[in-house]
Amino acid sequence: MNDGENYWNAFRSHKRSATDGPTLSPWMVTVLQATKLLLFALCNIVLTLGSVFSKLIVLIMATNIVPRAHLIGKFARKCTKAAVRRTSTTTAGIYLSLLLIQCFPDTINLIRSGIDMWKGQCGQLVKSVVVLESLRAIGLAVLSFHVFPQLDLARCLVLSACFPLVAVLQRSLVAMVSAARTGRSFRNRLGRCFVAIPHVIMFLVLMSSCYVWALFDNKFTAIIALPIGVICTSAGFWESWIDTTHSGTSFDELYRLKYAVRKMNTTTKLIVSLMRIVCTVSVLVSAVYINDHKKLNSSHFVKAFFSFSTRQPHTRLLLLATGIIVLHFVMRGISRFLAALDLHPFSFVHPLSIAPLIAYGYVRYACQSPTCSIARRLARFGLHWVCDQWFQSARGIASPDFYICLIWLLVGCYRGWRLVRQRYFDTNEEIISSMPPVCNGLCIEQSLVVFQHSLNRQEKTMLTEEEDISDENDELRIRNDEVDRVSTVYGCATMWHETETEMRQVLRSILKLDVDHATRMNNKKANELRYRLEGHIFFDDAWEDVEEDGIEKRQPNEYFNMFFDLLNEMTGERLNEEGKMETRILVNTPYGGRLVVKLPSGTLLFVHLKDKKMIRHKKRWSQVMYMYYLLGHRIMDCPLSIEDRQQMADNTFILAIDGDSKFEPDALLRLLHLMNAKSDIGCACGRIHPIGNGIMVWYQKFEYAIAHWFQKAAEHVFGCVLCAPGCFSLFRASALMDDNIMHKYTKTASEPRHYVQYDQGEDRWLSTLLLKQGYRIEYAAASDAETYAPEGFEEFFNQRRRWTPSSIANTVDLLMDYKRASENNDAISYAYIAYQFLVIFFSMLGPAIIFTMLVFAQVAAFELRGSDVMLYNGIPIGFFIVLCFTTESNIQLIYAKYMSIAYAFVMLAVLVATSSQIVLETVLAPTSLFIVTMVGIFFFAACLHPKEFTNIIHGVVFFLMIPSTYVFLTLYSLINLNVITWGTREAVAKATGQKTKKAPMEQFIDRVIDIVKKGFRLISCREKKEHEERREKMEKKMQRMELALRSIESGADVKKILDATEEKEKREEETQTADFPIEENVEKTQKEIQKANRYVWMTSHSLKVCERGKLKSAEKVFWNELINAYLKPIKTTPAEMKAVAEGLASLRNQIAFTILLVNSLLALAIFLIQKHKNVLSIKFSPIKNFRWTKMNEMTGQYEETDEPLKIDPLGMGIVVFLLIILFVQTLGMLLHRLNTMIGAFQEVKNLYEYGVSPVINTKNDDERIMNNARLMINSLGVSTGHAADGYTRHRGEESDTGNVLYKLQKARLAKRMQRSALSTTE
């Protein structure tokens, strides 16, 4: 059988695609696993030893409150040289240190809550939490200030183990009530009684701690304080006796707070913090009087707090307390970190269960074998080690309370183990991890417990951020069921005149998404991240006029044809028996045309062909198209309730990409995961990697790297990202639909600054609108995407000419409106605004800073006079400024290119001069220290990004191009601010309808050719006139026939078309003899012909294989209304264009003059200060006996000197501010890398949970990898709240960024009522 195929020629060659396996290479998986194990071990050690250290320090301070002149301990007898000299100030220092340890976290919470309440964030007071936390504060303070001073260290430790008293009592009562319940058999009751007996015994044992020492004949006087302290602390430790059984009971609020089902609201936080501070201070005051400190008064407390001297014990005590506070914050952070990694300390080594035993063992050992080094260290703080308060007997004879104390210790450790023991959950369960919302400094182990809880289906509907429970019948209540988990993602790409390589790149990414989407939707595993996918490509200016056989047609241009051929090649679609492709449908639309494609795995891809004669072109208007089409027409116009449409908007996301973007499905999944974690995120963006070839791309690789490593990470950590790149960002639909965002994005430029802010950087403007409305923009470093960067010098400069003014304009706009931005957006604080102000301020001073650096480096390298070098450098830069004001861009770019090459050699001199300065002045000199620190930080950042480490190599190119980019590029961008053309891909001027400016020689040649052509026309005009008339008549007849044939194919009325054509010919003949045309009939005729021509493009050679479709009437109406409202092609008159040009020139002059003046003044000031360095400098010696090398002007030799360095105060100030910015960004980078590392650990864990090996076996594991490898992003450990912040599912109805559909509906109803009222009055 032969069907036309040669089976013998079935062998093939094709490009090998990247392996669809895990994104983490095997060596990275191994390193991450080893790092994870090491971190787990280190964190457990820090938690355990830190808890022991904290507990011992607190107890040592507490046992030293009351002087012990009557007691001579073992340490005192052995270590006579470590005598302790106590003063009243030292005693006041002990009191203040314990107060600081306990109340400092509460003070921080009080301040933060006050600020939040000032912003209007309140809530209903949870009284039970206030009462119990007050009891805990009273209990801990009573024990620390009244009871512990009368005990020794060992007895203090065993008494601390009795805090689970109420928890044991509760278990006893539950068991006894269960045994006494009616309806049970005798055997069942007897069995339950036996179960209750151990709990009753433990309760009685722990209860004995309230009175046992009062039975002995000793000097213990805190008989009343002891039971009060133990019972209050035990009752206040409510996390130990509240569990899941209290859900729905009178303790339901406590249950929700413990398991982070609900956050502790601002009002409750403030009152709890205030009451804890008041209770602690009150108990401290009472202790000062009851403990009979005869010489202690308020002046001693004031002196202890304000008199700072590291030689005094009270200052050392306060510093020690500060160290303990820092340790507590670190341990709380470590506990949260382990919870985020889903790594919990082993139950038997948790601080709550093991710290008392370790501390007790160490105290017993130290008391049996006293070490004088401990005594000497404690003596420096005015403290001593208290071993045995009473019953000082011979060696080997135990005290009467020894055994009962040991039982307390064992019972307390057992109850601690029961509280922190690990629970095992099914992989399909949704787990919440939480920590106690209050930090207890005097008993830190209680604040290090991580609780886990599995949400059942009923509880999921009650998850809120605040305390108000949604009404079950509320129309706007959003349910969290399985349907909510399936998100809808619209992938929207904007194209113009991309190359074949760029188109192939974005198509390959879309096809990978198609496969991943189908795999996930078909896989029904619980808790798997699934999404619906639909692709949209908006082809800007995709049409051109083509004249064929004398007939002018409007057809898709060569770029779309190239895209269509490429799409067929990559999808492998074949023709059916009728010679058609069933998966390709062509549709006429009011904006041009549309190609609908069904991808191999079922995803629909809509290719929108925009005609600039029918709709506005450029990227911003394409974005307006898909926003209004997908969010307005698809969501707002659908016949659903407000609740359902709100749910659609919350679960709908737009993936904005460029026509050359390249990314993996995992990158999208990471962004989706981030968006699902927090509801206030309006947009999430990934790490953009520039690709391409050439020196300019190398420069951009390093530039992008440090921008993401430092600036973007710092923005993410300390505030929020200011710009979401349009090449790869995920937007939440409900955020875009909110007020002052999508609608305001349609605003056309009416002022000169609007052209810069709106049209030159549309991505930055959209980001600014989101930030002002209160939405966060977050950055996910692990979500990688690639895009082609400009490879040529001119294209790079033109790109930055657009970006720089737009970035500055939008940042200034945000800073000028900082009050509203800070009020609406919780992520934007005044400190963050100040940081952004510093960044933009120093970026504007970049030319002056780099210019002066070049000058002084050349002075040092070539040993020239500073004034001469400043003149030599000032002339070329000044000449470039003149060129920017007076000449065309191409001349400016040619000059900038050659000067960039020249200054690259100058930078080598800078490198030599800087190296010599470091050698001569040593690394400790301020300038040398700054340079070495900056280089070290860059290298450290590269080490923290191992996958991107090679970018550090491109830092050499970045260094050589510093003058080019920080001087010439900055000046070029600002002075050409009035040029609003894009400047990239300008080779295709044919499509834009504009002619590019030609060189003078080209213009001369064109004039000569025109003259020759006109001469030939004059010679042959008479001979060809009659021939031309006959030919025109023939062409008109052929045109009529061709129109008729094509009209038959399209189903149009042939007679009507022919009549219209004849009428048009008659009108043309009449217009040749008449003095005026009949315009209305001509326009009508043209419309008829245009209507017939609408189907001509579908019959082109490449597109005739596609099926034909028809737009639905509702969608056609929508597009017509949208175009009329926002997207009509903008027609400007010459007068309007002149006014715009003049306005832009005026704006350019103002801004350029200001920046040039400031930079000139700064450069001159630095130069003059350096010239008069001997008078206007600051003398600085980094260390004592500092020596450096200096040239002797008399001998010309280098000699060592001990003279102080002479520092320029202005330059030093700039260096200090730059260092501050760099350190802030480095801190932000470290915190962001920690967050990214948590995600990487989670991926490694999920790799093995879903059965994916990090080593790819392409022979046996292809199918398994296809089904499982993409599941590794679905980690619940990070998305659920693993700290005191609680579990966030959605925001409350009162939120400004919540229920967008409800707000829009209210506005619509208000307009309707207003119109009806007006009509009534009329």
UniProtKB/Swiss-Prot annotation:
Q: Give the catalysed reaction(s), semicolon-separated.
A: [(1->4)-N-acetyl-beta-D-glucosaminyl](n) + UDP-N-acetyl-alpha-D-glucosamine = [(1->4)-N-acetyl-beta-D-glucosaminyl](n+1) + UDP + H(+)
Does the keyword field hold Glycoprotein?
yes
Task: Please list the GO biological process terms of this entry.
Answer: chitin biosynthetic process; eggshell formation; positive regulation of protein localization to cell cortex
Q: Which GO terms describe its molecular function?
A: chitin synthase activity
Query: Which UniProt keywords are given for this protein, alphabetically ordered?
Result: Cell membrane, Coiled coil, Glycoprotein, Glycosyltransferase, Membrane, Transferase, Transmembrane, Transmembrane helix
Enzyme Commission number(s) of this protein:
2.4.1.16
Q: Name one GO cellular component term.
A: cell cortex
Q: Gene3D superfamilies under this entry?
A: Spore Coat Polysaccharide Biosynthesis Protein SpsA, Chain A
Q: Which residues lie on this side of the membrane: Cytoplasmic?
A: 61-128, 178-193, 243-269, 338-342, 418-836, 887-892, 944-951, 1170-1209
TM helices/strands, residue ranges = 40-60, 129-149, 157-177, 194-214, 222-242, 270-290, 317-337, 343-363, 397-417, 837-857, 866-886, 893-913, 923-943, 952-972, 1149-1169, 1210-1230
Membrane-topology descriptor: Multi-pass membrane protein
Which sites does the entry annotate for glycosylation? N297
Q: Where does the record place it?
A: Cell membrane
Identify this protein by name: Chitin synthase chs-1
Q: Which organism is it from?
A: Caenorhabditis elegans
UniProt gene name: chs-1
